[in-house]
Amino acid sequence: MSNDLPTKKDLVKWDQEDALNWTRGEYEIPNSKACGGEADGKAIYFCGNSLGLLNKKARQHIMEELDVWSTSSVTGHFNHPYQRPWKHVDEPLTPHLAKLVGAREEEVAHTSTLTSNMHNLFTSFYQPTEKRWKIVIEKGSFPSDWYAVHSHPRLHDKVLRPEQIDNAIIALVPREGEDTLRTEDILKVLDDNKDSIAIVWLPLVQYYTGQLFDISSISPKVHEIGALLGLDMAHGIGNVECKLNEWNVDFAVWCTYKYLNAGPAAIGGFYIRSGLEDGGRRLAGWWGNDARTRFHMSPNFQPTPGAKGYQHSCTPVFSSIPLLATLQLIEAVGFSNMVEKARRLTGTLEALLKASRYHVHPADPKGKIGFKIITPAAPYRGTQLSLVILPEEEHVMPKVFDRMLRKGLVGDERKPSVIRLSPVVLYNTFEEVGRAVEIVEEALEEEEEERKR
């Protein structure tokens, strides 16, 4: 993209020339009015970082599974007319997921939900001692991660003293006046606490700011001090390149309902590095038993080698099958091509937003209606841009968000003051990016006019 701002004609032309433009036709685009808009027609859906859209083949796959349930019932576990027997429903997904996260197939499991998987892995790999018991986590982490991490030191009250439990969490905070964490500041915290840290827990992409963490620089320091590195990849998988093996990450969890379009509250997954020892601490369930003997109903647990040995219950069919359609589509188009298009889409959104008269600069007068972008510049981000709606102290964000929604732009709000916009490669367009910026400006202009009355 040149330094000149693209015109509407440019945006239409880019869509026409886009080699991936056909993938939009694979998805069902929501109706604006059904989403709270004032007019009928397709919404501009920039909320795939919260819930991805329905793939048309996913609808087909779900209907097929309903038919199997109807006609074959329990025998669908073993004999399946579409060659997806339910007892092996995760197997077609594993190769795709492993490739997507940069891992070996035996290191990946497809099961449960993100926080439950997080608890599962922390139970095995958080093994505090008198000298090494602390967990590093960002202060602004997603609340479920924050709650989960805080709960684990309390489970070790036979090993840890009350004062150790009270001081088990090291919370990373940005510098004063900044919105995101600097890598050098994270490394300093690790150095300053090198003898007491057991686990470093970070997101790959931060849910609120959209920051992509430099894991390749952080991981060596984590292991140098003798700690383990765990990642929350909820906003990373399907959004940015993931290289868990290359980065030497110890364990990770993710969900599939955002960029992988598996549906509301769909199934999660996790990764465990080959060779990572759990010290005999494992929460066992029959789906973690060796698949060759699982249905023998033996009282003796024989874990499946690798990550699948940490599964508990059988794989939910109806929250797994929708995932297959998007994984197959990603394989067809090539994830590297998606990353390149995402760079252009989000870069265009950023450029147009920064050219807006409502983009607030530090030198602008205090109290001005507008927004600032707190998401880092490329390459330290994925598709998401987070806009802080100003002035923050006047809490105008909900009104601006509602105006945007009524005009047909579906983003999402994160209290206290952020609106997140995420143009997703598989179904959003450059023309939509241009219109989205216009809607942001219209919503802010209405707020500005209301203040003058």
Curated annotation (Swiss-Prot):
UniProt KW keywords: Cytoplasm, Hydrolase, Pyridine nucleotide biosynthesis, Pyridoxal phosphate
GO biological process: 'de novo' NAD biosynthetic process from L-tryptophan; anthranilate metabolic process; L-kynurenine catabolic process; L-tryptophan catabolic process to kynurenine; quinolinate biosynthetic process
Membership in a protein family: Belongs to the kynureninase family.
Main localization of the protein described in the UniProt heading: cytoplasm
Catalytic activity: L-kynurenine + H2O = anthranilate + L-alanine + H(+); 3-hydroxy-L-kynurenine + H2O = 3-hydroxyanthranilate + L-alanine + H(+)
Taxonomic source organism: Cryptococcus neoformans var. neoformans serotype D (strain JEC21 / ATCC MYA-565) (Filobasidiella neoformans)
Pathway(s) served: Amino-acid degradation; L-kynurenine degradation; L-alanine and anthranilate from L-kynurenine: step 1/1; Cofactor biosynthesis; NAD(+) biosynthesis; quinolinate from L-kynurenine: step 2/3
Location in or out of the cell: Cytoplasm
Cytoplasm listed as a keyword: yes
Name of the protein in its database record: Kynureninase
Presence of keyword Metal-binding: no
GO molecular function: kynureninase activity; pyridoxal phosphate binding
Enzyme class: hydrolase
Lineage start: Eukaryota, Fungi, Dikarya, Basidiomycota, Agaricomycotina
Pfam families named in the record: Aminotran_5, KYNU_C
